C-alpha cells in the first residue's frame, strides 16, 4: 500500500470515529460537572459543620463559666456550673428571753450569793440575776469553694452573753482538700471540735447552750474565733481532728497561749435507723498566755481560769469560778458516747481536767459530765454526720392551709461540773492548795418546735443548784464583798427561757 492509500484509509477511520469521540467528551463533561456540584455541596456542608462545631464549643464554654443562683433551704448560693467556685451567704439570729426565779436579794453584807472572783458587778448580779432578753448570736457571713479544692468561711457576730457586742470575728478560715484520704488542712480562726456537744452547730443543738462541762473544756483551747491550724480527716464511720491553737481573736496578752486540740470518733454499729457513736478527745495547753512581760528573775504569771454560766446567757454572770491559777500547763481528756434509734437519741460525755500548777502547791484536778436525750414527737430523726448529731428536718413544715405543724422535739439533760479541789467543809478556812470554784448541777427540760428548715423556737425549764464555799480573804473584793471563809456562796434557783432562731 502506497502512502497515499494509507493517508486516505486513516482519514476515513477518523471520519467514522469522530461522532463516538464527541459523545465521550460530552459524557465526561457531565461527570465532571456532577463531581464539581457534589464537591461544592460537600464544601458547603463542611462549612456548616465548622460553624455548628464552633457554636457548640462557644455554648459549652459559656455554660462552663455561667453562674447559677439557688435558695436551697433558704440559703442564697451562687455557683459556677462546674461547682469549682461557690459563694453561700449565711445569716443567723438567736434572740433569747429568760426569767430567773430566785430568792429575793438581800444586802451584800448578809446575802452571801456570789459570782466570779474579783468582779463587783457579778457580786450584785449573782443575788439578782437579770430577767430580760438579748441577742445571743446575730451573725452574717459567707462560705464556699474556690478553684475546686479550696473551701473558705467568714462569719461575723454581733451577739453576746448578757449584752450584745459591737461585733467580732466568729470564723475566718481557708481550707485545702487533698485528693487522697479525705484529708483537709484548715488555717485561720475557728473552733476545732473538742467534744461531741461542741462539734454540733449551735443552730442545731438540742438546748440553747452546751452543757457546762462541754462549754468549759471548749473554752480552754477551742471556741469561736480561736486562731488555729488543723488537719481534718474522716471516712464512712470515723473522723479525726488534730489542731494547734492560739488565743481567741481580740484577746490581749504578752506571749499567746499555745495548745493542742484532738478528737477521734468511731461508729462501731450502724443500721438504716440506728447507730452507736464512741469517741475520745483531748485539750492540752503547753504554754498558757502570759499576763505580763517575762522579766529576768521574775517570770510572768501564766494563769489558767475555769468558769461558766448556768447554761443560759441572758445574764452573763458566772456562778462557778476557779479564779486564776498560775500554771505551766493543763490537760483535759474526754470520753464520748452517743446512740440513736429512729427518732430517739442519747449522748453523754465525761471530762477530766488536770492543771500543772507552778510552785510547791499540789496540782488541782477537776471533772464534769452530762447526759442528755432527745425524742422527736413527730418522728423525724436527728441527722448524724461527721461525728455529731444535728437537728431534725421537719418532714411537713408548718402550713396552716395544709394543716401541717413542722417537727416537735422533747429534750432532757442533767449536767454536773465540779470546780472544787480540796474544798473542805462548810465553816472552815481552806488549806493552802484548795480551790473553791464550786460545784454546779443543772437539770433541764426542753421543747423545740422546728417550724421549717430555717425557723425554730426552743423553750426550756432549768433547775440549778450551785454548792460553793467562800475562800475568805478578799476573793470577791474588800470588806463585805467577801463573805467569811467557809460561808455558802452558792444558791438554788430555776430558769424559764425561750429562744427564737432564724438561720440560713
Describe the function of each predicted region:
Residues 68, 77, 230, 336, ...:
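Short, surface-exposed charged micro-motifs
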Residues 73-288, 365-402, 407-424:
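Outer membrane beta-barrel
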Residues 1-23:
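Gram-negative bacterial Sec-dependent N-terminal signal peptides
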Residues 23-61:
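Alpha-helical, heptad-rich or low-complexity scaffold/stalk segments
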Amino acid at each position: 500500500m502506497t502512502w497515499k492509500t494509507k493517508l486516505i484509509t486513516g482519514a476515513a477511520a477518523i471520519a467514522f470515529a469522530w461522532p463516538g469521540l464527541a459523545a465521550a467528551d460530552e459524557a465526561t463533561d457531565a461527570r465532571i460537572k456532577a463531581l464539581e456540584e457534589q464537591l461544592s455541596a460537600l464544601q458547603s456542608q463542611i462549612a456548616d459543620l465548622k460553624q455548628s462545631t464552633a457554636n457548640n464549643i462557644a455554648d459549652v464554654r459559656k455554660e462552663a463559666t455561667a453562674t447559677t443562683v439557688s435558695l436551697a433551704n433558704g440559703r442564697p448560693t451562687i455557683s459556677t456550673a462546674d461547682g469549682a467556685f461557690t459563694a453561700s451567704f449565711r445569716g443567723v439570729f438567736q434572740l433569747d428571753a429568760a426569767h430567773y426565779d430566785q430568792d429575793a436579794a438581800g444586802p451584800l453584807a448578809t446575802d452571801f450569793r456570789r459570782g466570779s472572783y474579783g468582779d463587783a458587778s457579778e457580786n450584785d448580779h449573782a443575788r439578782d440575776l437579770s430577767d430580760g432578753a438579748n441577742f445571743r448570736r446575730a451573725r452574717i457571713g459567707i462560705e464556699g469553694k474556690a478553684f475546686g479544692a479550696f473551701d473558705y468561711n467568714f462569719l461575723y457576730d454581733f451577739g453576746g452573753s448578757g449584752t450584745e457586742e459591737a461585733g467580732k470575728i466568729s470564723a475566718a478560715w481557708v481550707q485545702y482538700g487533698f485528693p487522697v484520704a479525705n484529708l483537709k488542712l484548715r488555717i485561720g480562726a475557728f473552733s476545732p471540735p473538742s467534744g461531741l456537744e461542741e462539734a454540733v452547730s449551735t443552730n442545731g443543738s438540742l438546748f440553747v447552750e452546751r452543757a457546762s462541762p462541754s462549754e468549759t473544756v471548749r473554752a480552754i483551747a477551742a471556741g469561736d474565733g480561736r486562731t488555729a491550724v488543723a488537719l481534718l480527716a474522716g471516712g464512712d464511720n470515723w473522723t479525726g481532728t488534730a489542731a494547734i491553737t492560739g488565743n481567741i481573736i481580740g484577746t490581749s496578752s504578752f506571749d499567746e497561749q499555745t495548745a493542742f486540740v484532738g478528737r477521734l470518733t468511731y461508729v462501731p454499729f450502724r443500721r438504716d435507723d440506728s447507730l452507736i457513736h464512741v469517741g475520745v478527745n483531748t485539750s492540752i495547753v503547753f504554754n498558757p498566755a502570759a499576763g505580763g512581760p517575762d522579766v529576768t528573775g521574775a517570770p510572768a504569771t501564766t494563769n489558767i481560769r475555769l468558769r461558766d454560766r448556768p447554761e443560759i446567757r441572758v445574764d452573763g454572770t458566772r456562778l462557778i469560778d476557779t479564779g486564776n491559777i498560775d500554771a505551766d500547763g493543763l490537760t483535759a481528756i474526754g470520753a464520748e458516747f452517743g446512740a440513736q434509734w429512729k427518732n430517739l437519741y442519747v449522748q453523754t460525755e465525761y471530762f477530766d481536767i488536770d492543771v500543772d500548777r507552778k510552785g510547791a502547791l499540789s496540782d488541782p484536778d477537776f471533772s464534769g459530765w452530762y447526759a442528755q436525750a432527745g425524742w422527736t414527737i413527730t418522728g423525724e430523726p436527728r441527722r448524724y454526720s461527721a461525728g455529731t448529731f444535728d437537728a431534725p428536718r421537719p418532714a411537713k413544715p408548718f402550713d396552716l392551709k395544709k394543716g401541717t405543724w413542722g417537727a416537735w422535739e422533747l429534750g432532757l439533760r442533767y449536767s454536773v461540773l465540779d470546780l472544787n479541789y480540796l474544798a473542805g467543809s462548810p465553816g472552815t478556812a481552806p488549806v493552802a492548795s484548795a480551790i473553791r470554784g464550786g460545784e454546779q448541777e443543772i437539770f433541764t427540760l426542753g421543747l423545740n418546735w422546728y417550724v421549717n428548715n430555717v425557723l425554730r423556737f426552743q423553750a426550756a425549764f432549768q433547775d440549778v443548784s450551785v454548792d460553793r464555799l467562800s475562800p475568805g480573804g478578799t476573793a470577791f473584793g474588800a470588806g463585805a464583798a467577801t463573805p467569811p471563809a467557809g460561808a455558802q456562796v452558792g444558791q438554788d434557783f430555776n430558769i424559764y427561757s425561750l429562744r427564737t432562731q432564724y438561720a440560713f
